[in-house]
Amino acid sequence: MKILMRADTHVSYSVPAEGPKANFTFSQVLAALSVSLCSLVVGFVSAYTSPALVSMTDRTITSFEVTKDAGSWVGGIMPLAALAGGITGGPLIEYLGRRTTILATAVPFIVSSLLIACAVNVIMILCGRFLTGFCVGIASLSLPVYLGETLQPEVRGTLGLLPTALGNIGILVCYVAGSFMNWSMLAFLGAALPVPFLILMIIIPETPRWFVNRGQEERARKALKWLRGKEADVEPELKDLMQSQAEADSQARRNTCLELFKRINLKPLSISLGLMFFQQFSGINAVIFYTVQIFKDAGSTIDSNLCTIIVGIVNFFATFMGILLIDRLGRKILLYISDIAMILTLSILGGFFYCKAHGPDVSHLGWLPLTCFVIYILGFSLGFGPIPWLMMGEILPAKIRGPAASVVTAFNWFCTFVVTKTFQDLTVAMGAHGAFWLFGVVCIVGLFFVIICVPETRGKSLEEIERKMMGRVPISAVVNIKPFSFNM
């Protein structure tokens, strides 16, 4: 799944080398929780098709026909709409503000779910899914920008985990509820989830950086006071923000989107695009969107709805494992582990479905698909899930980070659409085994891409990474591992 955890797309940070240790102020926790509740909604709607399509295509439950082709569009139209939303979200967060843009998605999220819940034909469902996807695309840009501009660097890693965690909770909620709700009732639940997010977003302020960008120094000061605490001295931070904005304005006048295609910038852009390609063509969103259908086709001896719940739980806990390990093992080691796990499990899944279709009998191995799915999700969530987004924010040069990240984000959503829309067609043309083997071959190519092209960025500042990516100093492609500390 691509729950939509996007890196810092339209903003670059100026972080002092030294500074006071940040505290987990209640206001910062509240701000992070408020926007992360939007991520919970995103997780829920992204996973919706997995449990919903089974009852949606059942004529004893649904009063109108949903063909297999229409079902593929129910899954595929959301990422296509998210691509459009992602492109639209960039200008919106600049002109309306980060908070206002996020807040503006709440009501459409509710309306889109109600449109699906009350649908009397496939067109209404598709319209609801398109509106849902459009909001998801906007959220995918605006959530990380808001958090990046409001949280202090010392707590950004911990509180920045909340969107990923709540997004995975949203997936799990959808799987659990989908085990006993039909598609219509599940959509009604989806309409209720944005309400807490809507209420909390009204309470929190706009980001100080956006106020500074608009020349509203006093409002920026008030927002910083709210976020840092009334007793905090916010003047040094405000001064840094104003200086950073002045430098960004100066660069914006000198550089255009044509900078993206200069040879010196193509290397980091190509690496980021490559990581996004291999992330999506590992087949993750096909797995998330069609989990129930896959287990049903596999003839697993374990209830398909229970299988999806187990997959959701694994996805949730694997996220925390990745966070704990990424600054210990480094990016490349986790990408290696991730790729190898996906290659092995996709190969075995392909073999299982081949034997199921052509023999020998594998009915006694009904537990095998679930085992492979668990390891596959675990591997993806450790590496190729979060790291492409993290590295997008690390390796793209500051002066092109905004437009470059928009290109990378749009490309990711395009790949998501292609995978989710064509998965069922692939299973018809090649068989389920052929589809899984194809994803496995892509993962093998992705492994070589990581070995040869992807730099190790652990422990390096953004400035150091940029100097190396620009070729001013050589960059190492060799992994480096930080020893574990057992101090409590």
From Swiss-Prot:
The regions listed as transmembrane in this protein's record are 29-49, 73-93, 106-126, 130-150, 161-181, 185-205, 269-289, 306-326, 333-353, 373-393, 403-423, 434-454
**Segments on the Cytoplasmic face:** 1-28, 94-105, 151-160, 206-268, 327-332, 394-402, 455-488
Is the keyword Heme in the record? no
- Which Pfam families does this UniProt record tie to the protein? Sugar_tr
Recite the UniProt keywords alphabetically: Cell membrane, Glycoprotein, Membrane, Transmembrane, Transmembrane helix
Q: What does the sequence similarity comment in the record state about its family?
A: Belongs to the major facilitator superfamily. Sugar transporter (TC 2.A.1.1) family. Trehalose transporter subfamily.
What is the name of the protein in this document? Facilitated trehalose transporter Tret1-2 homolog
Give the species this sequence originates from: Drosophila simulans (Fruit fly)
Highest lineage ranks of the organism? Eukaryota, Metazoa, Ecdysozoa, Arthropoda, Hexapoda
The gene name on file is Tret1-2
